[in-house]
């Protein structure tokens, strides 16, 4: 991380999916068709910071991209909040 960068407090899976779609030049409609959901549902998924793992597996397969690794890499990075492992409300 560059010294001028602000740490990323959360890994937003929806934004990560949207960025990968753009990088590949694919559309929301294409991905929705690939994973068997409506475009509207996919927009809802991409607005969230969280996702069901079965849906993420489908998206990973469709885009040939490992979002699980991306999330894991973020968790190991300096951007990961130091107090994120606290589970006061569990």
Task: Cite the ranges covered by each PLM segment.
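Short polybasic/polar patches that bind polyanions
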Residues: 15, 22, 33, 47, ...
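Key DNA-contacting residues within the recognition helix of helix-turn-helix
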Residues: 18, 43-44, 71
